[in-house]
Amino acid sequence: MKRKLIVTADGSHSFYLEEMDEHYHSKHGSIAESNHIFIEAGLKQKSAEKSNFKLLEVGMGTALNVWLSALALKGSGLKVNYTAIEAFPLSLDEAQNLNYPDLLGKGHALFNKIHQSEWELPVQLTEEISLLKQQASLQSLSLEQAYDLVYFDAFAPEKQPELWEESIFRKLYDSMTKGGLLVTYCVKGVIRRRLKAIGFEVEKLAGPPGGKREMLRARKV
């Protein structure tokens, strides 16, 4: 896959995938988007509910969400089993070109550890996070864990429609605990209806600064 490194509005890097005409993050700010949708609306909400939980990320991409999650949990005393799925991982060279640690002035060794860790083997990333990276498509995986939180960060429905089908959300729903949360940037009506049809309680929240007006958070009830 041919990826072009770009700079988003908040100064943080992302990639543009030419063959799909798709960006890995919002052009309005990679870090701003990830912090708002996945950390604030997802991780912090679940952290207030449970001190020990399992997290699934669909679409690890640049590992920005993994890194920001680890930074947010530092010193919290929480324990999180984090599974990150990615079908087309970055090369180490691509990862090392990303400016997230330089931009925030911290987390350099942590970011490198995420990308240098082996695939398919659990690693104790920090005191709080045990990380398992899996190189696979969501469709091919058997989800055996009971996840309390899902970061759904696939490419847009019009670019990767197979990951937004009702069958995919059913698979996720069945793998989640009661009260489990799913957060995503997409608020399209058809996606909301699919989530509701399966049994999720769906709410629209304010979107990230300068980016999309709204985001979605769904809870298994």
Region spans (language model):
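Rossmann-like AdoMet
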Residues: 1-53, 70-100, 104
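Conserved beta-strand/loop positions that form the S-adenosyl-L-methionine
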Residues: 58
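Glycine-rich SAM-binding Motif I of class I
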Residues: 62-67
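S-adenosyl-L-methionine
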Residues: 94-144
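A short SAM/SAH-binding and catalytic strip from SAM-dependent methyltransferases
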Residues: 148-162
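Conserved beta-strand signature within the Rossmann-like core of class I S-adenosyl-L-methionine
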Residues: 149-151, 178-186
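A short glycine-rich, Lys/Arg-flanked "PGG" loop and its adjoining helix->strand segment in the class I
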Residues: 162-178
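Core SAM-dependent methyltransferase catalytic element
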Residues: 198-221
